[in-house]
A protein has these predicted regions:
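Generic multipass alpha-helical transmembrane bundles of integral membrane proteins
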Residues: 62-185
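N-terminal topogenic module of multi-pass integral membrane proteins
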Residues: 1-107, 205-240
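C-terminal transmembrane helix-loop-helix hairpin of multi-pass membrane proteins
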Residues: 138-145, 152-240
Length: 240
């Protein structure tokens, strides 16, 4: 069932409730992430059940992800020196547009691949954020990974792939990217780590054992993503 993909939203919201509480005012960057996550959770099912994403639609989703990121962190970006502001703002926009657009175009039709991408992105972002000095954003990322694991596990047990679609893909990848950007702007995560994490969906798209049992596919594709996530964590380490 496509709505099973909302597990990542549930995991993220529960984590946020216990870490900082769910509030909407004052409108900080973290609370804007909350708003964007809820909006993505509403838009995803609409795309699956009422609309069919075309190439133009995917481009609009990618542009929306980039625009949402800049909206969430614009006040923080403006506080940086000019060169840093351009570098951080550009990295954030490019990373979010690419990872969300690529995942929706290339992975949304495969519940195992996109679940593995969200798992690796969530855990990788969470660990990188903790290394960079942000425990709260680290917990958000790990919660996202846990939600993605909850989406993958039933598929592995049943031996059948589940539908993911935009319901899972858009919020899962968007939240992972936003958490990474938050760790960059509000902690000490290097900008290039965000760009490396944006490649997790690409790694999961690489050829794999397509005819193997579902559980083995999940393991292999997750390992692909973990390699890239591990590189991002390793690059984050010297900056801590």
């Amino acid at each position: 069932m496509r709505l099973g993909g909302l597990a990542v939203i549930a995991a993220f919201l529960v984590c946020m409730h216990f870490v900082t509480g769910i509030q909407f005012t004052p409108l900080t960057a973290t609370r804007k992430i909350l708003i964007l996550a809820i909006a993505a959770a509403a838009i995803g099912p609409l795309l699956d059940f009422a609309l069919t994403p075309t190439r133009i639609g995917v481009a609009l989703i990618a542009a929306g992800a980039a625009g949402g990121t800049l909206w969430a962190f614009w006040p923080v970006i403006l506080q940086k020196p000019a060169m840093q502001a351009w570098l951080f703002g550009g990295s954030a926009a490019v990373a979010l547009a690419f990872m969300v657009g690529f995942a929706q175009a290339q992975l949304a039709g495969d519940g195992i691949r996109v679940g593995a991408a969200a798992l690796a992105l969530g855990l990788g972002t969470g660990i990188a954020a903790i290394i960079a000095g942000s425990l709260s954003y680290g917990l958000y990322g790990i919660a996202l990974g846990a939600g993605a694991g909850g989406f993958l596990l039933p598929q592995m047990i049943r031996g059948e792939k589940a539908a993911a679609g935009a319901t899972f893909t858009v919020p899962a990848i968007l939240i992972g990217g936003l958490v990474a950007v938050g760790a960059m702007l509000l902690a000490q995560l290097p900008w290039y780590c965000v760009l490396v994490l944006a490649l997790v969906p690409v790694a999961v798209r690489l050829p794999g054992p397509g005819k193997a049992p579902v559980w083995l596919q999940a393991v292999v594709f997750s390992l692909y993503g973990f390699v890239i996530a591990g590189v991002a964590c390793a690059l984050a380490w010297p900056s801590s």
